[in-house]
Regions:
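C-terminal catalytic histidine-bearing segment of alpha/beta-hydrolase fold enzymes
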Residues: 176, 181-223
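Hydrophobic residues in well-ordered beta-strands that form the structural core
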Residues: 59-60, 134, 184
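Serine-hydrolase catalytic machinery in alpha/beta-hydrolase-like enzymes
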Residues: 4-101, 195-199
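Short beta-to-alpha linker loops that shape the active-site pocket of alpha/beta-hydrolase fold enzymes
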Residues: 63-66, 138, 190
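Conserved alpha/beta-hydrolase "acid-adjacent" motif
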Residues: 162-168
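Primarily recognizes the serine-hydrolase "nucleophile elbow" in alpha/beta-hydrolase
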Residues: 94-150
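Short beta-strand/loop motif that positions the catalytic acidic residue
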Residues: 149, 155-157
Length: 223
């Protein structure tokens, strides 16, 4: 359904996986899909395809420039080596590309590392991002300009998640004291990455289905 494309990134060129809906389903809405710490792997491409089946134009930028991880140790190294300033340019470029295609503000949706970057991109691009979804997001090097956030945030969290869950109280406090619109859900009995069906040891079908329904509802409401 999708293909790799090139797009502008701060005067340079970035790449990403673009999935386009069929004409009979197209909503004229765009979603930036942001990778887990594994990189732009097949799972993330399938998520972009899944959005296209729902009628959204979806672009998943390749933040690791072609690198992917085969083990948690490799993934952690790639996550920590990520240049946040360069990632910000890639995310802005993806937002701008989708806004050009759709003619309107877009959404950001991210998983794991990408969950933090979804919120980061929404904070950094308030005029261009109208909805934000965070799946169990975290990244130790990302700092958020919460004052700049305009998009309503949907947070999807696992019950058992030492990586991401320390962020829940912080995000709620920062969003709440600024009267930002947000809605958080924690899925009982789940672990980090419960949406990733390539990881049977953590995948939870019921939580994946329910969280996807909430994601689509959120995007439909605000885009």
């Amino acid at each position: 359904m999708g293909e790799m494309i090139k797009f502008g990134s701060g005067g340079k060129t970035a790449s990403g996986y673009m999935a386009i809906p069929s004409p009979d389903k197209a909503r004229g809405r765009g979603v930036v899909v942001i990778q887990e710490w594994w990189g732009l792997v097949d799972h993330i491409k399938r998520v972009a395809d899944k959005f296209a089946l729902e009628g959204f134009h979806a672009l998943a930028p390749d933040l690791y420039r072609g690198e992917t991880a085969g083990s948690p140790d490799e993934a952690e190294k790639l996550l920590m080596a990520l240049n946040i300033a360069e990632a910000e340019k890639d995310l802005r470029g993806a937002v701008e590309r989708l806004r050009f295609v759709t003619g309107r503000p877009v959404a950001t949706v991210g998983f794991c590392m990408g969950g933090a970057l979804s919120l980061f991109a929404a904070c950094s691009n308030p005029k261009d991002v109208a909805a934000c979804v965070v799946y169990y997001g975290g990244h130790p090097k990302v700092e958020f300009d919460f004052d700049g956030l305009a998009a309503p945030v949907l947070g999807q969290w696992a019950e058992d998640d030492d990586f991401a869950n320390p962020n829940i109280a912080r995000f709620e406090a920062e969003l709440g004291k600024r009267d930002k619109a947000y809605e958080f859900h924690t899925y009982p009995g789940t672990k980090h990455a419960f949406f990733n069906d390539d990881r049977p040891e953590v995948y939870d079908r019921d939580a994946a289905v329910r969280s996807w329904e909430r994601t689509i509802d959120h995007l439909t409401r605000y885009l």
